[in-house]
């Protein structure tokens, strides 16, 4: 009711517990590494046409994990709520009855521990036309986006890397403009875009499973 948190009561509860801390604090870590290459070529065709084209390459790796930072008066923590979901066929360590009840301390990983990877390759082009009061353009692009993950908690080393899934995307756009005078113009643009889904929606649960949507 007061908007405060009774840490002393939590510490007393954890200290009295014979099965480890009931409440702890962990930090969510999300470390991102990006690399990219964008190269563009431009040229003219005659006096009225301008052409632009290029490639767009991108690579992403994201480390996602939760690490215990405070046991709040307890001596250890048991992450049974998450470890009970680790399947033996994915991680052989789960065959040990003690796996679910392993005593964890500050610095140990809970809940999630995986790397997410994204690789994208694309090409694009645009042709523009300009003559007097009239201008027009048409453009398009194609891309291939690949997603995969590497999990260190729910999967052992033999199964840690998921299969890659590739999504082909593309777009096409066009438009025309006519300047009626110095202050007024009329124009029309249209386009269609098909892009890859977000990384998280490629997996049923990207936090703990290689299983895919679709």
Regions found by a protein language model. Give the residues of each.
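Outer-membrane beta-barrel domain signature, strongest for Gram-negative TonB-dependent receptors
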Residues: 1-66
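Surface-exposed loop/turn segments flanking beta-strands in extracellular/periplasmic regions
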Residues: 2-16, 65-109, 158, 206-214
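Residue-identity detector for threonine
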Residues: 2-4, 18-19, 33, 39-43, ...
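Alpha-helix-centered segments that form part of catalytic cores
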Residues: 14-33, 99-122
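Short N-terminal secondary-structure initiator segments
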Residues: 23, 31-41, 81-100, 195, ...
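Structural signature of Gram-negative outer-membrane beta-barrels, strongest in the C-terminal barrel
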Residues: 50, 56-58, 104-214
């Amino acid at each position: 009711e007061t908007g405060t948190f009774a840490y002393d009561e939590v510490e007393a509860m954890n200290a009295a517990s014979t099965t480890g801390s009931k409440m702890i604090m962990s930090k969510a870590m999300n470390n991102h590494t990006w690399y990219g290459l964008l190269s563009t070529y431009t040229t003219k065709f005659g006096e009225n046409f301008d052409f632009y084209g290029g490639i767009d390459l991108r690579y992403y790796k994201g480390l996602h994990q939760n690490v215990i930072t405070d046991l709040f008066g307890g001596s250890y923590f048991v992450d049974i709520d998450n470890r009970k979901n680790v399947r033996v066929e994915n991680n052989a360590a789960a065959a040990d009855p003690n796996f679910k009840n392993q005593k964890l301390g500050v610095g140990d990983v809970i809940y999630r521990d995986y790397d997410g990877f994204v690789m994208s390759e694309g090409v694009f082009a645009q042709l523009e036309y300009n003559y007097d009061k009239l201008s027009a353009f048409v453009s398009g692009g194609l891309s291939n986006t690949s997603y995969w993950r590497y999990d260190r908690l729910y999967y052992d080393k033999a199964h840690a890397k998921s299969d890659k899934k590739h999504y082909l995307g593309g777009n096409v756009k066009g438009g025309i403009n006519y300047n009626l005078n110095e202050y007024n113009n009329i124009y029309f643009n249209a386009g269609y875009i098909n892009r890859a889904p977000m990384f998280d929606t490629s997996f049923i649960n990207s936090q703990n499973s290689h299983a895919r949507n679709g």
